């Protein structure tokens, strides 16, 4: 990032010189005919569940959420106003009261280091636990080629860690922020339910306290088209 003057990670795939990290290791249990689910263990809050085929928690997005198959820039993978901790010990609860609605909540170690098991930072030293709550609505708009899936998410987060104020007046604890993440398929090439060719759009917005966060607000918009070139049905342009 320093070489190109970018505030965000220019390549979210690059993780340094380490050869391997254990990203997640957890116990998972479903309840109520799979309408409720809980995970306990080492968890990654940026990649948890799906609902109606859409990312269900947290700050998910169907068209801008995967640095391996979509955009490389970190700000188009997750909202940079959200201070997600490294994968570490935590609890995630995901509930789907209806087919078109979900609620997700999590508490995780704010001091986590992905290179460790998580026990050192979670149970020794400051009791800093990052919390996040999200709800999403998943409408399907009618079209001649079948339903057009959308996802409209809103969430808030809480970070108890002390942060230095930029004006030098001390530190602040109990930081809070809000975010939105939206994606919508607007055009399908054919009626096959298993065929994802077509155009999808996305948008994100987030806000955080400017006195302790470098990014006080953020927005992004974009889209992707799969199968734009005839006979190249799996190619994606973003």
Where are these regions (language model features)?
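Non-catalytic alpha-helical scaffold/packing segments enriched in small hydrophobic residues
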Residues: 153, 177-184, 202, 218-223
């Amino acid at each position: 990032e320093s070489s190109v003057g970018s505030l965000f990670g220019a390549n979210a795939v690059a993780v340094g010189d380490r050869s391997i990290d254990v990203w997640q290791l957890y116990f998972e249990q479903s309840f109520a005919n799979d309408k409720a689910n809980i995970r306990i263990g080492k968890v990654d809050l940026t990649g948890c569940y799906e609902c109606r085929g859409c990312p269900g928690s947290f700050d998910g997005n169907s068209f801008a959420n995967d640095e391996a198959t979509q955009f490389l820039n970190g700000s188009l993978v997750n909202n940079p106003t959200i201070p997600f901790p490294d994968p570490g010990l935590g609890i995630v609860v995901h509930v789907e009261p209806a087919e078109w609605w979900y609620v997700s909540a999590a508490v995780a170690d704010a001091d986590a280091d992905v290179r460790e098991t998580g026990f050192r930072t979670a149970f020794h030293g400051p009791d800093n636990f990052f919390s996040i709550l999200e709800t999403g609505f998943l409408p399907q708009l009618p079209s001649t080629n079948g339903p057009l899936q959308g996802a409209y998410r809103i969430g808030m987060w809480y970070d108890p860690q002390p942060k230095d104020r930029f004006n030098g007046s001390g530190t602040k604890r109990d930081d809070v922020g809000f975010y939105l993440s939206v994606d919508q398929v607007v055009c399908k090439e054919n009626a096959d339910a298993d065929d994802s060719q077509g155009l999808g759009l996305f948008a994100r917005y987030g806000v955080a306290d400017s006195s302790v966060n470098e990014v006080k607000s953020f927005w992004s918009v974009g889209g992707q088209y799969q199968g734009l070139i005839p006979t190249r049905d799996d190619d994606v342009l973003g």
